[in-house]
Swiss-Prot record:
<dbReference type="GO" id="GO:0008270">
    <property type="term" value="F:zinc ion binding"/>
</dbReference>
<keyword id="KW-0863">Zinc-finger</keyword>
<keyword id="KW-0689">Ribosomal protein</keyword>
<keyword id="KW-0862">Zinc</keyword>
<keyword id="KW-0687">Ribonucleoprotein</keyword>
<keyword id="KW-0479">Metal-binding</keyword>
<dbReference type="GO" id="GO:0005840">
    <property type="term" value="C:ribosome"/>
</dbReference>
<dbReference type="GO" id="GO:0006412">
    <property type="term" value="P:translation"/>
</dbReference>
<dbReference type="GO" id="GO:1990904">
    <property type="term" value="C:ribonucleoprotein complex"/>
</dbReference>
<protein>
    <recommendedName>
        <fullName>Large ribosomal subunit protein eL43</fullName>
    </recommendedName>
</protein>
<dbReference type="InterPro" id="IPR050522">
    <property type="entry name" value="Ribosomal_protein_eL43"/>
</dbReference>
<dbReference type="GO" id="GO:0003735">
    <property type="term" value="F:structural constituent of ribosome"/>
</dbReference>
<dbReference type="InterPro" id="IPR011331">
    <property type="entry name" value="Ribosomal_eL37/eL43"/>
</dbReference>
<dbReference type="Pfam" id="PF01780">
    <property type="entry name" value="Ribosomal_L37ae"/>
</dbReference>
<comment type="similarity">
    <text>Belongs to the eukaryotic ribosomal protein eL43 family.</text>
</comment>
<dbReference type="InterPro" id="IPR011332">
    <property type="entry name" value="Ribosomal_zn-bd"/>
</dbReference>
<dbReference type="InterPro" id="IPR002674">
    <property type="entry name" value="Ribosomal_eL43"/>
</dbReference>
Length: 93
């Protein structure tokens, strides 16, 4: 198997094709989609991507919907923080 260089990492499989800037964008996506994420249910780093937008924990078996390349999208994080703030205000006042 061919050795990838330190610089290009996971996108070394594309060689010199497609241009440098596109390979940099693809590297960011592929690194995030292949990494493990923290499971909110069991508290371990065991969540991996199963398919586009489907993330599953190997430890507790929970399946969660998320983004295509990352587990949490920016809009989902915003909605969640607003919801938590609204619920906290309802409890307090």
């Amino acid at each position: 198997m061919a050795k990838r260089t330190k610089k290009v990492g996971i996108v070394g499989k594309y060689g010199t094709r497609y241009g440098a800037s596109i390979r940099k964008q693809i590297k960011k996506m592929e690194v995030s989609q292949h990494s493990k994420y923290f499971c909110e249910f069991c508290g371990k780093y065991g969540v991996k991507r199963k398919a586009v937008g489907i993330w599953g924990c190997k430890d507790c078996g929970k399946v969660k919907a998320g983004g295509a390349y990352t587990m949490n999208t920016a809009s989902a994080v915003t909605v969640r923080s607003h919801t938590i703030r609204r619920l906290r205000e309802q409890i307090e006042g």
